[in-house]
Amino acid sequence: MYTHQKNSITAGVPVAEAKKAVIFIHGRGSSAEDILSLNNHLGIKDAAFFAPQATNNSWYPYSFMAPVKENQPALDSALGLIKELVAEIENAGILQDQIYFVGFSQGACLTLEYITRNAGKYGGAVAFTGGLIGKEINMQNYKGNFKQTPVLITTGDPDPHVPVSRVETSKGILEKMNAMVSLKIYPGKLHTISKQEILLAKEIVFDSNQLR
């Protein structure tokens, strides 16, 4: 088992000068560099970009549908790393409602798990193929009010790693916590991020907030 060390790469506007911040969370077997390249396609202006790097290129060792204890201590370490990064961004002067999250696959699961455990008014979140973590959902972990934070969740049907049923359950939980969730299911989509998903993320989460 393993934990994570603080190791993020950055791009975009320096955080001290930025109006917003975007945290990109990579998938299993990928890297911070890979996920950070999405910023070139999302067209986000006046933003500081952050991408933390997981130990062993994996935020937790087993499936997100495994019992939570089997993914410890890596999972708690990953959640703590994201929380520390958010605190640093806020300390630099960026308000919570100008902080955004983008994750793919394992990173999408971690994105949803983090924001739902720490619900508040964020700028927005995009989960490309992901759902809340655990063999069973523990509602005691989830507290707060999203205050209409826009959240986009996408997935393929079927997806080899992420059951559509868990994606739909996750959507319902976030909505009960007052998130404004958009879910898009693509029949037969490969386990990748498509051009259509990027355009949808721009439309639902980023373009509508450029003038805020």
Predicted regions, residues:
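Active-site nucleophile loop of the alpha/beta-hydrolase fold
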Residues: 52-55, 126-134
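Short alpha-helix in the alpha/beta-hydrolase fold that links the catalytic acid
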Residues: 35-38, 139, 163-173
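Serine-hydrolase catalytic machinery in alpha/beta-hydrolase-like enzymes
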Residues: 2-96
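Short beta-strand/loop motif that positions the catalytic acidic residue
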Residues: 152-155, 159
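C-terminal catalytic histidine-bearing segment of alpha/beta-hydrolase fold enzymes
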Residues: 168-212
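Gly/Ala-rich beta-loop-alpha elbow adjacent to hydrolase catalytic centers
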Residues: 102-107, 111
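Conserved hydrolase catalytic core segment
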Residues: 113-124
